[in-house]
């Protein structure tokens, strides 16, 4: 049987941000996570990461031998997902914070709208002291999205 959702997180030298992201995942269903470390200066504390994850699900770790950049690390996560049997995949950057039940809302939307294959989210950008800086609001209608792409 297919597992429902895996979250991919590329990571480089932002351990506190990674913990913040892991701790912010609060859903009512099992979610696995794959973290690809992009050659950080110090090895991840896997035990602390696992103990910080309060949701149900497994955490998998991959390590690149040097810093190749977020694109390569994200693609390494995708390679892991392709070898597995997840129905859905989500992406977080280390430091991203999730609202409670964010993924359930997105999955419910996808399952009710089979013609749609990809969803995104708006974002609130916070400063280093978690103070609000600004919103990022991506377009939500097809024609606006097309204009942004080309």
Q: Where is each model-derived feature located?
A:
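Nucleotide-sugar donor-binding/catalytic module of glycosyltransferases
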Residues: 2-150
């Amino acid at each position: 049987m297919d597992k429902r959702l895996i979250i991919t997180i590329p990571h480089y030298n932002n351990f506190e941000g990674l913990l913040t992201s892991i701790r912010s995942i609060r859903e009512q269903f099992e979610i696995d996570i794959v973290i690809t470390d992009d050659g950080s200066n110090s090895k991840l504390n896997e035990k602390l990461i696992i103990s910080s994850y309060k949701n149900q699900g497994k955490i998998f770790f991959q390590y690149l031998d040097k810093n190749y950049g977020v694109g390569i690390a994200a693609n390494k996560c995708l390679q892991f997902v392709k070898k597995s049997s997840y129905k859905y995949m989500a992406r977080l950057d280390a430091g991203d914070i999730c609202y409670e039940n964010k993924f359930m809302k997105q999955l419910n939307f996808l399952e009710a709208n089979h013609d749609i294959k990809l969803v995104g989210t708006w974002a609130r950008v916070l400063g280093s002291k978690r103070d609000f800086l600004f919103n990022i609001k991506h377009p939500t209608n097809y024609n606006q999205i097309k204009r942004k792409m080309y």
